[in-house]
Structure formats: C-alpha cells, structure tokens
Amino acid sequence: MSVKDEINKLIETINYHNERYYNQDSPEISDYEYDKLMKELISLEEEHPELKRIDSPTNRVGGKPLDKFNQIVHKTPMLSLSNAFSEQDLRDFDKRVQEYVGENVEYVVEFKIDGLSVGLTYNNGEFEKGATRGDGVVGEDISQNLMTVKSIPLKINDKKELIVRGEVYISKDNFRKVNEQQEEQEQPLFANPRNLAAGSLRQLDPKLTAKRPLDIFVFNMENIEEYDLESHSESLEYLEKLGFSVSQSYKVCKSIDEVIEHIEYWTDNRGNLDYEIDGMVIKVNNIKQRDEMGYTAKSPRWAIAYKFPAEKKKTKIVDIIVEVGRTGTITPSAILEPVRLAGTTVSRATLHNEDYIREKDIKINDTVLVQKAGDIIPQVLEVIKEERTGDEIDFKMPEKCPVCSEPTIRLEGEAAVKCINMSCPAQIRRGIIHFVSRDAMNIDGLGESIITLLLNEKIIQDVSDLYYIKKEDVVDLERMGEKSADNLINSIEKSKENDLWRLINGLGIKFIGVKAAKILAYNFKDLDEVISATSEQLEELEEFGSIMANSVVEFFKEDKNMNVINKLKNVGVNTKSLDNTGEKVEKIFEGMKIVLTGTLPTLKRNDAKEMIEKRGGKATSSVSKSTTFVLAGEEAGSKLTKANDLGIKVIDEERFLELLKLSSKDEVKAVLES
C-alpha cells in the first residue's frame, strides 16, 4: 500500500469512529486505540506534508500556536443589523419593507444565537479560511481554531467559491461542564457561554480551542447571488445538504402578525433551549425583493434583529455570607431581597472572590442590578451608587475559617482565600456531597440536608462511613421514616457495584474530575494499580501532566485517605474497572436521538438518560425533525407541543421500559412505527 493510500485509509477509519463517537454515541473502539490511529496519521502527515488533506481529522485537534492573529479583509462586508425592541418597531419595519416591494412579503424568522459571529470561505470544495466579524470590513484570521470545531465541514460538495456566515456558540450543558472542570482545577469560572465561546476562538494556541466543546449554526450565504436560489429558506436547505449545521427552529412567516406570534412564543420559551439566544432575526425571504431593497451604509434594509427584553432586575444585598468548598476555597455570596429573574426567584448571587467585590465596590445594604449570566448563574452586575444612604457596610473576607476557626490564607497570585485545615468539617461535608453526587457514586436519597444530619449526629465522619450505616441509625432522623430509610440503604448498597471511575472521581482528588477518572479507570485494571502508579507512569497517560500526576500520587500517600480506601474495600465497594468486563447491553437505540421531557412516574431523568446512552442512543435537549422519539412524563410542556407539531413519536415510561426488553434496533423501530 502506498503512503497516500495508507493516509486515506487512516482518515476513512478515523472519520468512521468519529461518527460513531460524536454523532451516534456508540463508540466501537477505546480512546487508547483511537489515539493510536491519530498518532499514526499525524506521523505520516509530518513525514509527507504534501499528502495532507484539508479534511484530515488531525486538523480538528489544532496546529502550532500563533504569535498573533493576521487580519483578513472580508470579500463581502459582514454588516450588522438594525434593532427592534418592541412590537411597534417590528410593524414599522414591515411598513418600510412594503413601501419598497409591495404587500406580498414573506419573512424568515431565525434565532439570534448569542455567540461569536464568523465568516467561512470555501473554494473548490474545501475550507479555505475563516475570520471574526471584526469591524465588518476587516476581521481576524482564526482559520486554525475554526478547523477544530467539529460541526464546521472541511470539505463540501460544491466547487464554487462559497462564503458562509455563522455563529459559534457553546451549549448551556457544556458551559456547566467546563465550569465544573474549572472549579475542580481551582481556575476562575467563565461568566457566561458567549464569553467562553469567544475566548476559546481567540486562543493563540489552537490545541486549547480544540479542547472546548464549540458548535456552530450557519445562517447566511453571503454570496447568494452567485447561486440559482430564489429564497433565503432555500439557501438554508442547501447549506444543510452540504453538511452545515442549520438551526431547525427557523420559520417562514406569511405576515408580520405571524412573525410577532413566533417571537412571542420564543420570548416565553427560550429557557427550554440548551443554548443562548438573545433575540430573533427577521429577514425578507425572497432574494429579488432583497435586491430591490438594498442596503444602508451599516445594514441591510431587508432584515432586522429583535432583541429580547434585558434580564436584569434591581434588588438589595441584605447580607454577604461565605461558604467553604471541599478544597477549602472560601466563596462569598450575596443574600438578596428575593426578585423574579429569567423565570425563577433569585435570593442569592455569587460574588466569586475578594477581588470581584473590591472591583465592583460591593457593600452590604447596597442596591444592585442582578442578572443571570447565561440564564444560569445569578450574579451582581453593578452597584447603583446613587441610591446609597450611608447605611452600607464594607465586607472583608474572614481571617479565620467560619467553620473550624483555623486561620485562612491567600496565596500570592491567587484570588481565592482558603482554609487549609484538612479536618475542617465544612470540607468534609462538601467532600461527602461530592462523593454521592450524580457524576460520582450517584447515591439517591443523600441530599445535603441528610448529609448534614448524619454528620451532626456523628453517624458518619468520612465517605467510607456511609457504607456502615444501618437502617436503625437513620430511620428516626428528621424527614426520614421507614420507606425513605429502606430506599437510602438500598441506594448505598447498589452503589457498591459502580465502575471504578465513579469511585476515583468521588474520592475528590485535586485536579481529577470525571474525564481524568475515566482515563485512570481505563488504563489501570483496579484501584491498587492506580495507587501504586508512579508520577512518571501517570504522566504518560493522555491529557495527564505533572500537576495531575503528582496530585494523584500525593493523595494516596496520605494515611487518612488510605484508611478511607481500606474501609471501602472491606465493606465490598467495587475497586475494579468494569470497562471490558461489564454486562453486555445491545445497542437497540443506536443512531437514535431521544428527547426526555416532564417528570417520569418512577425513573429519574438521569437514570433514563443513562439507559438510552448505554444502548447507543443520544439523549438530546431539544426537539427537531431529526428526533427519533420523545419520552414524556407529567408537565412535559413545550417540547411535547413541538413534538406533536412535527409529528414526532411520543411514548410514556411504560412503553419505554417495554422497549428496553427488546433485543435489536429493528425491533425497536418496528414498535415505534406501529
């Protein structure tokens, strides 16, 4: 086989496994085997750079770091849109449109994705370059970074020059996961999904961008006049055929009343989406009518952006409290006079750290503006200083831990104030909360209040004590009772069978989160092998550096930690990796996209999601034309409505449990079609 054929074969194989992993959630090979294929391809491409293809999967992992971004002059200016803030603004826009082209007007309404706007250029069927919007005329060349975004095709079946505009974003779920990783590594949290997406694309090192779970929706062919297309909606369908990701939510509207109705629906329901939108974009659909209307110096006359009302509210800080995390970090929070914000009642907001409080000059009794960063995390936006009365009180971070009274420290170069007493009850409590959490040992019935009771009653002192609890220890606790006590004991007992990665993550080793725990569990057959591994051995693992490796080694050197592990072993907690020895489950949902909505009678949402994913399905957060079926419980809401509108199959929990008993994907399809 020639080198060229070898490279082509490797690319074909890797692309196949990427499809299985990213789009079907049904991998056929291990991460280790996948990495071996990638390394082999990288090696061949480095030896024969003339044979490297534009669509090589190695372009997805990022190239060499840049010193700076070069500038690109946009062939077609990336204009901004004029804004509408009210129904009257939209009706005025419609009136202006009709003055140009008459009453026979059709509009396309799309989400205004809250991300970073980019332009993509393709030539001869290959991705050529990509740039930020910049000032609309000149942008920054971020081609290398854009090539790492998996939803951007690097090859398309179109030999013409094609210029596409899109919005790079990060989903709410992935935003939460990235911030959880930041917290585990004691790094600053990102304020909102847009900042994370924009910051990720502007990294000078593309390998850092490649690690961020970025996505894109494309929404415009900038050189549409070179194509035989009559409408904007046709262009979106064409882009989708080429392999671009197009938001399925766009709607063709026959009148401005229909436009307004669609906008009102999404104003109320945008919180159900797994990504941020900050408005809706309204465009004249007909291309000839657009040409008749033309442009102003700054924006097209045939489009307008409707901005959702700002999600900000005024309230008062009645107190500032601090909490101790499981790593000892002391975090301040503002206690607020309750206020309705983005659909929920907000009574507290994060203040991050001492520097944040100083920078914004925040005091107790201040009147402030609050918002939900990314509609997720309540935060203090600014102090309304003109409303100060003189009763405001300065806040100082505590010099002693509020729980154990040991001195606190702030290391040079760090923003966090910490309690370094490893026996601090607050750290122990947070550590146990982490141990039982969904991404660790996943023990149902052990909420924060129960854990606090168990600690206060001296029933437990560390995580291993959970497995020595008897029913009589807990049955008389507040809000417990016979049934709850039985459920709790059963849940604890069930968790003994968990895979090794859950235990490793639950132990709370500094810098080791879910992903690193899975890497350890895959590369070592049991916990004893992990414990005896040297830092040199650990550094050889993919994505492990010296800091993570040393953290693992140091953790297992501590007698206190080893005592806990020995107690866990003695009581029968699994310490072996089940990666290759677990029960085989047929992939009956392979390639299917399944949406969960509402409250199920007996199953928890996460359990149902795990059942779907274990069987090869993908549990998605929004209903679209590609959804296979919707699993609906009580109070299903807008997702159920949309599924019915699109003709998507809807089943209840009882039918879902019947599907789990089937032995093949074909059987599932037959049942769904019946």
From Swiss-Prot:
Keywords: DNA damage, DNA repair, DNA replication, Ligase, Magnesium, Manganese, Metal-binding, NAD, Zinc. HAMAP family: DNA_ligase_A. Coiled coil: none annotated. GO terms for biological process: DNA repair; DNA replication. Belongs to the NAD-dependent DNA ligase family. LigA subfamily. It comes from Clostridioides difficile (strain 630) (Peptoclostridium difficile). NAD(+) binds at residues 31-35, 80-81, 110, 133, 167, 283, 307. It holds the Pfam family DNA_ligase_aden. It catalyses: NAD(+) + (deoxyribonucleotide)n-3'-hydroxyl + 5'-phospho-(deoxyribonucleotide)m = (deoxyribonucleotide)n+m + AMP + beta-nicotinamide D-nucleotide. This is DNA ligase. GO terms for molecular function: DNA binding; DNA ligase (NAD+) activity; metal ion binding. Disulfide bonds: none annotated. Zn(2+) binds at residues 401, 404, 419, 424. GO terms for cellular component: cytosol. The active site is at residue 112. Its EC number is 6.5.1.2. NCBIfam families: dnlj (TIGR00575), PRK07956.1 (NF005932). PANTHER family: CHROMOSOME TRANSMISSION FIDELITY FACTOR 18, DNA LIGASE. Its cofactor is Mg(2+); Mn(2+). Residues 584-673 form the BRCT domain. InterPro entries: BRCT_dom, BRCT_dom_sf, DisA/LigA_HHH, DNA_ligase, DNA_ligase_AS, DNAligase_adenylation, DNAligase_N, Hlx-hairpin-Hlx_DNA-bd_motif. SUPFAM superfamilies: BRCT domain (SSF52113), DNA ligase/mRNA capping enzyme, catalytic domain (SSF56091), Nucleic acid-binding proteins (SSF50249), RuvA domain 2-like (SSF47781). DNA ligase that catalyzes the formation of phosphodiester linkages between 5'-phosphoryl and 3'-hydroxyl groups in double-stranded DNA using NAD as a coenzyme and as the energy source for the reaction. It is essential for DNA replication and repair of damaged DNA. The gene is ligA.
